[in-house]
UniProtKB/Swiss-Prot annotation:
Protein known as: V-set and transmembrane domain-containing protein 5
UniProt gene name: VSTM5
Region (Important for CDC42-dependent filopodia induction): 170-186
Alphabetized UniProt keyword annotations: Cell membrane, Cell projection, Developmental protein, Glycoprotein, Membrane, Signal, Transmembrane, Transmembrane helix
Protein species of origin: Homo sapiens (Human)
Cytoplasmic compartment segments: 169-200
UniProt membrane topology term: Single-pass type I membrane protein
Keyword Glycoprotein: yes
Cited PANTHER family: SIGNALING LYMPHOCYTIC ACTIVATION MOLECULE, V-SET AND TRANSMEMBRANE DOMAIN-CONTAINING PROTEIN 5
Transmembrane segments: 148-168
The UniProt record lists the keyword Protein biosynthesis: no
Length: 200
């Protein structure tokens, strides 16, 4: 086999070098990106419940994680932190938020006003970022209303039972009183008849 001319060897070497450089650049760009996974994009909850807004991310280095809340009442920042450091929690959510190193947060004792959109932004130190949204619906606890109605009905039933018992007792007393009165009337009538007989 004849050796290739030196010009062809150079172009083949350059093209292989360019190919290797492109592969390395693609791998480098891929490793610098941020990926974010949200297992549950919509959460339904009831009042006073503790809610976990669960996410997972992957990136090189330590990112900055930020959660914001958006609803009919406006948009506000909830918390910002870097995993392994102390979180900067807003005043509106002090003592109501717990952060996790995987980017998740837990909201304690949610209310109807907590319904809305929760947006997480994960920003890598080189500037690339990724965001995701979780929708939270918080509804009133229906059984509390039913409990209130049940208590009122039980109270009314107890009052009705007491009234019926009082009516029964009053009826018995009235019956005894009438019986006594009839008996006295009978006695007085008998005495009158006897007196009339004696007078005659």
């Amino acid at each position: 086999m004849r050796p290739l001319p030196s010009g062809r060897r150079k172009t083949r070497g350059i093209s292989l070098g360019l190919f290797a450089l492109c592969l390395a650049a693609a791998r480098c760009l891929q490793s610098q990106g941020v990926s974010l996974y949200i297992p549950q994009a919509t959460i339904n909850a009831t009042v006073k419940e503790d809610i976990l807004l669960s996410v997972e991310y992957s990136c090189h280095g330590v990112p900055t994680i930020e959660w914001t809340y958006s609803s009919n009442w406006g948009t506000q920042k909830i918390v910002e932190w870097k995993p392994g450091t102390q979180a900067n929690i807003s005043q509106s959510h002090k003592d109501r938020v717990c952060t996790f190193d995987n980017g998740s947060i837990q909201l304690f004792s949610v209310g109807v006003r907590d319904s809305g959109y929760y947006v997480i932004t994960v920003t890598e130190r080189l500037g690339s970022s990724q965001f995701g949204t979780i929708v939270l619906h918080v509804s009133e606890i229906l059984y509390e209303d039913l409990h209130f109605v049940a208590v009122i009905l039980a109270f009314l039933a107890a009052v009705a039972a007491v009234l019926i018992s009082l009516m029964w007792v009053c009826n018995k007393c009235a019956y005894k009183f009438q019986r006594k009165r009839r008996h006295k009337l009978k006695e007085s009538t008998t005495e009158e008849i006897e007196l009339e007989d004696v007078e005659c």
